[in-house]
């Protein structure tokens, strides 16, 4: 009797297990049809690592100059000599600042005196994009000089863009901060015709550079002093004309920068004041023209003239601890470039570029060699 009940219960259990297993298998074996998803993307032609800041990201940065924005890139070393009024350079992959090419609207900035570009004099108020390459630019269609950089920084200024109901844009800003910083700026963009527009950007920077510090004297009392001769007066102005043509564009840019600044130094013989001064004037005028002649041939022309002036003064009559130095440097540069691109196949382009550059450097130093260079 007990054995019959046992086998009946065992049979019912096996039947229920088989029923549940078949039900589970039916759920697992059911088919669900999903609609197809098509993913499209452009082929990335950047074969060299690139980092870029543009648009809203650039405007939201708590930065004043291009050097401050480049701090957000990886793999770079920023050298800042003296805050707002000091020289600011960048070092990419430990190649040195002399091997970094800085390009403003596609044309390289030069310095025949020491080969170093001060990034602190380029403001972000009129900047559209800042791009950094760990080498040359990936594009094949570029001037010959662009192929010879161990590291490249491309600064792209704003190009006016207007809505249909707008013929001009005006942007005024005012910034202030510690150490007596006053920084107003104005940007005006005007639509001259359907294909021609103009822009004017001005900026003024002033700071006293004064701040308190503690000076300890051996065998005496600590003294609270104020750093002096750290003031900066800087004016930047640039204007541009922009034109659109069929399958191309042209643009012309004029840039002017003038500054006077003091150089504070160490406390020597209990003297807290330093009278070293420096005056800088930088001007350049450049033009670019680009046009595609069908799908086979493209032409790019660049031209530039630059003039740079530097005056450094250290007067021992005002500061006994210094040697008299009164040096002036004047340099000029002329640059011409022509790039040609021929498209043989969709996957094969040929670029032929030729550049010419003339540099001249003068100074008031004794036995100065007065270098000239044609490249």
For each feature predicted by the language model, list its residue ranges.
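Transmembrane beta-strands of outer-membrane beta-barrel proteins
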Residues: 168-172, 198-200, 250-252, 298-303, ...
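A beta-strand signature from Gram-negative outer-membrane beta-barrel systems
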Residues: 124-171
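N-terminal periplasmic "start-of-domain" segments of outer-membrane beta-barrel proteins
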Residues: 31-61, 89
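Flexible loop and strand-edge segments within Gram-negative outer membrane beta-barrel domains
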Residues: 209-213, 224-234, 248-300, 305-332
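Transmembrane beta-strands of outer-membrane beta-barrel pores
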Residues: 157, 174-178, 204-208, 245, ...
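Residues on the lipid-exposed face of transmembrane beta-strands in outer-membrane beta-barrel proteins
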Residues: 186-190, 237-243, 285-291, 336-342
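Extracytoplasmic beta-strand/coil segments of soluble accessory domains associated
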Residues: 71-108
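Outer-membrane beta-barrel transmembrane domain signature of Gram-negative proteins
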Residues: 311-375
């Amino acid at each position: 009797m007990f054995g019959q009940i046992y086998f009946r219960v065992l049979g019912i259990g096996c039947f229920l297990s088989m029923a549940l297993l078949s039900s589970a298998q039916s759920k697992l074996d059911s088919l669900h049809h999903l609609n197809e998803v098509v993913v499209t993307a452009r082929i990335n032609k950047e074969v060299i690592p690139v980092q870029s800041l543009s648009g809203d990201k650039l405007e939201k940065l708590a930065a004043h100059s291009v050097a401050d924005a480049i701090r957000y890139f990886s793999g770079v070393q920023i050298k800042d000599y003296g805050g707002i009024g000091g020289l600011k350079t960048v070092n990419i992959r430990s190649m040195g600042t002399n091997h970094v090419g800085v390009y403003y609207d596609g044309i390289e900035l030069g310095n025949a005196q020491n080969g170093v570009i001060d990034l602190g004099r380029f403001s972000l108020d009129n900047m559209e994009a800042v791009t950094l390459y760990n080498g040359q630019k990936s594009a094949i269609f570029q001037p010959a000089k662009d192929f010879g950089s161990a590291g490249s920084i491309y600064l792209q200024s704003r190009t006016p863009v207007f809505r249909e109901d707008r013929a001009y844009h005006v942007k005024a800003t005012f910034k202030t901060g510690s150490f007596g910083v006053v920084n107003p700026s104005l940007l005006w963009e005007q639509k001259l015709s359907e294909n021609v527009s103009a822009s004017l950007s001005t900026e003024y920077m002033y700071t006293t550079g004064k701040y308190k510090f503690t000076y300890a004297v051996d065998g005496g009392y600590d003294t609270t002093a104020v750093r002096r001769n750290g003031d900066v007066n800087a004016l930047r102005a640039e204007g541009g004309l922009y034109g659109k043509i069929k399958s191309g564009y042209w643009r012309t840019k004029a840039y002017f920068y003038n500054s006077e600044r003091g150089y504070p130094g160490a406390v020597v013989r209990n003297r807290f004041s330093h009278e070293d001064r420096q005056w800088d004037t930088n001007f350049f005028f450049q033009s670019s023209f680009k046009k595609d002649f069908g799908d086979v041939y493209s032409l790019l022309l660049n031209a530039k003239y630059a003039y740079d002036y530097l005056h450094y003064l250290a007067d021992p009559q005002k500061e006994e601890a210094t040697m008299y130095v009164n040096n002036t440097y004047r340099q000029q540069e002329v640059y011409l470039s022509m790039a040609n691109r021929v498209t043989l196949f969709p996957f094969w382009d040929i670029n032929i570029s030729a550049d010419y550059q003339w540099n001249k450097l003068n100074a008031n130093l004794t036995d100065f060699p007065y270098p000239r260079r044609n490249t």
